[in-house]
């Protein structure tokens, strides 16, 4: 049995029963060619031509490979370091352990997942010009590439709902930590089930290639449209509507159409800054992943491997840039996160409220263990004027009595 496959997966494989003749010399080869049907010979020649064409067009210039490697390497390092720092700061610092930061940790874990399980293999495929890890690994890499944006956009929708009820309806509904954990778990589980068809669509009958896009069959096209609507368009519209209501409430637009001054707003300034940060975070995420979904709907033909690889690498780099930008936004717009980073870098459970040096003494170690001590300092003998029968209040002596004893020339270190 001889199996002839088309490279673009448009048609099912053609199966034709032929006589297997050992091609040991040219005469036997000619005899075998005579036994093959004309249609199968055409597919065989097309397959050979496509293989040669692939080897020619799949080779990339050294400049393209070097440029892509530098940009992806910088984003990869920044994403790994930044998102790991986000998880570490929220874990160590109590000031950052809020309900909203549960969602932030979930997004950081999703960014770490795509940084480890997807992006390095995409760069490897682009730089080497072929896929060398097999069809099963191709399915796994593409699965994680579809999983993480869906999880993140629904986590962002959960944050939007939390901000909406916290600011607009603070007494009617509250997103507690248990509810936040359930919302995060639902986002991961539902999206993990929703992107399982990727295992069936991706992969190729050619072992040295991993498809960049979904196949152009009607099943692949239908799933692409459904994934674009459910995994991007609908949650994006809901996010925009919720934030529109939040912004409208912050600026206090009354029923009579009169806008109040911002200084008269009852919303705390810290919550306004949080809304600004997450609004900017949503915009960066949506604009970063929009090219990826558009490329799945409209993309170069899979046979043009060089063009498809360049387009796929470009949209992957743009979408991956959102993973590296999130820690930067947290550090710029969130003062508690900056303080948490200072506490984390101090490598101590004691919080660093000051940036200057702190003198560590025996008394300060006692204070760290919540001991309170008062050193009895004998008062200085002094002559008291007998103008009154009452002693005058001496503030300096009282302060000396309550002062900590400090040794001479104590060592200066950072907590």
Curated annotation (Swiss-Prot):
The keyword Protein transport does not apply. The chain crosses the membrane at residues 70-90, 103-123, 153-173, 183-203, 222-242, 278-298, 310-332. It is a multi-pass membrane protein. Glycans are attached at residues 25, 52. It is found in: Cell membrane. Residues 91-102, 174-182, 243-277, 333-415 are cytoplasmic. Keywords: Cell membrane, Disulfide bond, G-protein coupled receptor, Glycoprotein, Membrane, Receptor, Transducer, Transmembrane, Transmembrane helix. One of its GO terms (molecular function) is G protein-coupled receptor activity. One of its GO terms (cellular component) is cilium. Gene3D superfamilies: Rhodopsin 7-helix transmembrane proteins. The keyword Cell membrane applies. Pfam families: 7tm_1. Disruption phenotype: GPR19 deficiency induces a shift in whole-body energy metabolism by increasing energy expenditure and decreasing glucose disposal in a sex-dependent manner. Male GPR19 knockout mice show decreased whole-body glucose tolerance, combined with decreased expression of key hepatic glucose production enzymes, under obese conditions. In addition, Gpr19-deleted mice exhibit a prolonged circadian period and a delayed initiation of daily locomotor activity by causing the downregulation of several genes that normally peak during the night, including Bmal1 and Gpr176. InterPro entries: GPCR_Rhodpsn, GPCR_Rhodpsn_7TM, GPR19_7tmA. Disulfide bonds join 138-210. SUPFAM superfamilies: Family A G protein-coupled receptor-like. Strongly expressed in the brain. Its main location: membrane. Residues 1-69, 124-152, 204-221, 299-309 are extracellular. G-protein coupled receptor that plays a role in the regulation of circadian rhythms and energy metabolism. Participates in maintaining proper circadian gene expression in the suprachiasmatic nucleus (SCN), the locus of the master circadian clock in the brain. May function as a coordinator of aging-associated metabolic dysfunction, stress response, DNA integrity management, and eventual senescence. Upon binding to adropin, modulates mitochondrial energy metabolism via the p44/42-PDK4 signaling pathway, influencing pyruvate dehydrogenase activity. Belongs to the G-protein coupled receptor 1 family. This is Probable G-protein coupled receptor 19. It comes from Mus musculus (Mouse).
């Amino acid at each position: 049995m001889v199996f002839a496959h088309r490279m673009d997966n448009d048609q099912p494989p053609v199966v034709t029963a032929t006589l297997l003749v050992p091609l040991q010399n040219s005469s036997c080869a000619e005899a075998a060619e005579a036994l093959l049907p004309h249609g199968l010979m055409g597919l065989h020649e097309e397959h050979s031509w496509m293989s040669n064409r692939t080897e020619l067009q799949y080779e990339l210039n050294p400049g393209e490979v070097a440029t892509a490697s530098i940009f992806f390497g910088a984003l990869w390092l920044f994403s790994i370091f930044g998102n790991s720092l986000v998880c570490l700061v929220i874990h160590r610092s109590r000031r950052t352990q809020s309900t909203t930061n549960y969602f932030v940790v979930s997004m950081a874990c999703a960014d770490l997942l795509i940084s480890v399980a997807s992006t390095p293999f995409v760069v490897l495929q682009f730089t080497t010009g072929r896929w060398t890890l097999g069809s099963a690994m191709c399915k796994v890499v593409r699965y994680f590439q579809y999983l993480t944006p869906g999880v993140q956009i629904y986590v962002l929708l959960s944050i939007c709902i939390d901000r909406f009820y916290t600011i607009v309806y603070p007494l009617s509904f509250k997103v507690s930590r248990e509810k936040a954990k359930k919302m995060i778990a639902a986002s991961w589980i539902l999206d993990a089930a929703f992107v399982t068809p990727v295992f069936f669509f991706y992969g190729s009958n050619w072992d040295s290639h991993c498809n960049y896009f979904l196949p152009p069959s009607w099943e692949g096209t239908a799933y692409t449209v459904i994934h674009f609507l459910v995994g991007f368009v609908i949650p994006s519209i809901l996010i925009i509507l919720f934030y529109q209501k939040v912004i409208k409430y912050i600026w206090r637009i009354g029923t009579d159409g009169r806008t109040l001054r911002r200084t008269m707003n009852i919303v705390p300034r810290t919550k306004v800054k949080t809304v600004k940060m997450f609004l900017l975070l949503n915009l960066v995420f949506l604009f970063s992943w929009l090219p990826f979904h558009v490329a799945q709907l409209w993309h170069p033909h899979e046979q043009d491997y060089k063009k498809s690889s360049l387009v796929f690498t470009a949209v992957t780099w743009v979408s991956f840039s959102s993973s590296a930008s999130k820690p930067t936004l947290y550090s710029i717009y969130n003062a508690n996160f900056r303080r948490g980073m200072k506490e984390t870098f101090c490598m101590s459970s004691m919080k660093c409220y000051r940036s200057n040096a702190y003198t560590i003494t025996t008394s300060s170690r006692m204070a760290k263990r919540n001991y309170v001590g008062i050193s009895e300092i004998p008062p200085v003998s002094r002559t008291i004027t007998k103008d009154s029968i009452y002693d005058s209040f001496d503030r300096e002596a009282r302060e000396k009595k309550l002062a900590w004893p400090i040794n001479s020339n104590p060592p200066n270190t950072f907590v």
